[in-house]
From Swiss-Prot:
It is found in: Vacuole membrane. GO terms for cellular component: vacuolar membrane. It comes from Emericella nidulans (strain FGSC A4 / ATCC 38163 / CBS 112.46 / NRRL 194 / M139) (Aspergillus nidulans). The chain crosses the membrane at residues 35-55, 109-129, 144-164, 168-188, 270-290, 301-321, 365-385, 399-419, 434-454, 471-493, 507-527, 536-556. Glycans are attached at N84, N255. Vacuolar effluxer which mediate the efflux of amino acids resulting from autophagic degradation. The release of autophagic amino acids allows the maintenance of protein synthesis and viability during nitrogen starvation. This is Autophagy-related protein 22-1. GO terms for biological process: amino acid transmembrane export from vacuole; autophagy.
Length: 588
């Protein structure tokens, strides 16, 4: 039997009512890729390019010059005839540094964009925690993903109607859109382990899953011990399935397991497809900006196009992704399922506490999350800082900034598809590939710091003194992002106890997005203090370097072994749910 071109070797035994154990098919994978194609444009084109400079420009049009704090900033986008003014001849005032007053506080217009991002990340972290219970249990995972996509894309489109007089409203729409994007990507990431777990190539493995063929007599009782002890899902189905020896036997001694290979491939394709879509839309946005004479309206118009793209291409994902329901969430006192959202939210916060406590037994997850906390903060902060630096201190126009992003994305596509080849040829473990990306990433802030060296400063170029220097740095940033985006996500998935994907991916996302509260805010503070962005490169260089020793300590084999053992222990404690699921299984 075949479905959408992929052979269906059999069906896994359901663990609870509504459990979707069908093998992953081509249409489901296309649905997963489709949302990356839809939403990655906001990450790359909006957050990575046009949204920060739109917020800065709208605030600038309502601000005053930092030099005298009375002269209004220009009301239109003005760039000198020659944008090649070297940094050493440009004071912050000459570079057009502007400030606005928000709640009586003096805020640099570049800092306004950074603070807006920090606030959105804080709200995003709270939202991600609150929804994780509904993502793990019941059939809400897909519904929430589509809902957040709709809200986020509409808010992005509404920025078109925002004028500089109400620039704070633009910041509000940006906060909502970025919050929804982050929440939707958490839900999308939680599908990845399920797509891998039910992938036909894994189901065909001799030592893999025991399956029930659809042609067999489904009326025969199937005991819960029909699963092999080598099955990574066995701990979810029986309380006394795996011993530590079993888990050690299950884990291959090779550098990369079959599951990690499939997970990395799917993740890399998803990132690559998303970047391809972003490159295409970015090209359209640049043409629109040039044709509309690079005004503030031009920036708002391209943000509308980004939101429209996000909305339209979410539709295939809404149709093709399977809900893949989780087990029902039962109340401890009566064993009945939760019916209200308040119940799900309360459970989610309690679950976060339990998940955080569980990580005490998972040394490698702790090490990875600590490293990822710092690394993801650096990734998010470098992107926004570079764009605002190029606009406010190198006086680059929107079209030029858009071209940098195109180069970055092309490099990202190349990186997403090539890092797996490089790691395979060099026989690198996933953690080693991530470390190589970190070393390459460190070059970006170090290059910016060259501008402080007097000998280089006197040259008038190098050390980010000329606009053209942003382009090669964009290539490096793209290569790094292509590798980190795919490898970190899939590598973390291998360290998660089976059956707890959404909870641990919520922790992953909170670590990722939550850390980004600090980096942009610190850069904003540095910018407010010094009147320019360049000193923030010292902070970024340290921030990117700190994850290295932590990542070096991560042991993938030990992490996977500990995760499987913990899953067994956790399932053994869930006696009520085990009885309910066991009764259901015996009725099959």
């Amino acid at each position: 039997m075949q479905e959408d071109g992929i052979a269906e070797p059999g069906l896994l035994l359901p663990r609870y009512p509504g459990d979707d154990t069908r093998p992953t098919n081509k249409k489901e994978l296309l649905g997963w890729y489709s949302y990356g194609w839809a939403a990655e444009v906001f990450t790359v084109c909006a957050m990575g390019s046009f949204l920060p400079i739109t917020l800065e420009q709208m605030a600038r049009e309502r601000g005053v010059l930092l030099s005298d704090k009375t002269t209004p900033c220009t009301a239109i986008w003005k760039t000198p005839e020659s944008s090649n003014t070297s940094w050493q001849n440009s004071s912050p005032a000459a570079a057009g540094q502007c400030i606005v007053y928000i709640l009586g506080a003096e805020i640099n217009t570049a800092s306004f964009a950074m603070y807006t991002f920090s606030v959105s990340v804080l709200i995003q972290a709270i939202l991600i925690i609150s929804m994780s219970g509904a993502a793990d249990h019941g059939s809400y995972r897909k519904t929430l993903l589509v809902s957040f996509a709709a809200i986020g894309s509409i808010c992005t489109m509404l920025i078109l109607a925002v004028t500089p007089k109400v620039y704070l409203l633009g910041g509000l729409f940006a906060i909502v859109a970025n919050t929804c994007l982050g929440a939707s990507f958490v839900l999308l990431n939680s599908f990845l382990p399920l797509l891998v777990r039910y992938h036909p190539s894994l189901l065909k493995e001799e030592s893999g899953y025991m399956v029930r063929s659809p042609t067999e007599n489904s009326g025969q009782p199937i005991a819960t011990d029909c699963f092999s002890n080598d099955d990574p899902r066995a701990a979810l189905l029986q309380g006394d399935g795996m011993t530590p020896e079993d888990t050690r036997e299950f884990i291959s001694s090779s550098n990369t397991s079959k599951e990690l290979t499939i997970s990395t491939r799917i993740s890399s394709y998803g990132i690559g497809i998303g970047y391809i879509g972003a490159v295409f839309l970015q090209g359209i946005c640049i043409l629109v900006i040039v044709q509309t004479r690079q005004t503030t309206f031009s920036l708002r118009l391209v943000l509308f196009l980004i939101g429209l793209w996000w909305f339209i291409f979410t539709i295939p994902a809404a149709f093709w992704l399977r809900p893949r329901p989780g087990p029902p969430l039962l109340r401890a006192q009566d064993g009945k399922a939760y019916q209200s959202w308040l119940g799900y939210m309360a459970y989610a916060w309690k679950s976060l506490g339990r998940t955080a406590m569980r990580t005490r037994h998972l040394k490698d997850i702790l090490l990875f999350l600590a490293s990822w906390f710092l690394l993801s903060d650096g990734i998010a902060t470098v992107s926004g800082t570079a764009v605002l630096f190029a606009k406010t201190q190198l006086n680059m126009e929107p079209a030029a900034l858009g071209m940098i992003n195109v180069i970055t994305m092309i490099s990202g596509v190349f990186g997403a598809f090539s890092w797996s080849y490089v790691s395979r040829v060099l026989n690198l473990r996933a953690s080693q590939t991530i470390i190589a990306c970190i070393f390459l990433f460190e070059l970006v802030p170090l290059y910016g710091l060259l501008g402080f060296i007097p000998a280089i400063k006197n040259l008038g170029f190098l050390g980010l003194q000329q606009p053209w220097e942003m382009f090669p740095l964009g290539v490096i940033y793209g290569l790094v992002m292509g590798g980190l985006s795919s490898y970190c996500r899939s590598f973390f998935g291998q360290l998660i106890p089976p059956g707890y994907e959404a909870s641990f991916y919520s922790l992953y996302a909170i670590t990722d997005k939550g850390s980004s509260v600090f980096g942009p805010a610190i850069v904003g503070f540095i910018t407010d203090h010094y009147g320019e962005i360049r000193p923030a490169f010292f902070f970024l260089a340290i921030l990117i370097l700190l994850p290295l020793p932590l990542m070096l300590l991560v042991d993938a084999d030990r992490g996977k072994r500990d995760a499987l053992a913990l899953a067994e222990v956790l399932e053994a404690r869930s006696s009520l749910e085990q009885r309910d699921y066991g009764t259901f299984s015996q009725q099959q």
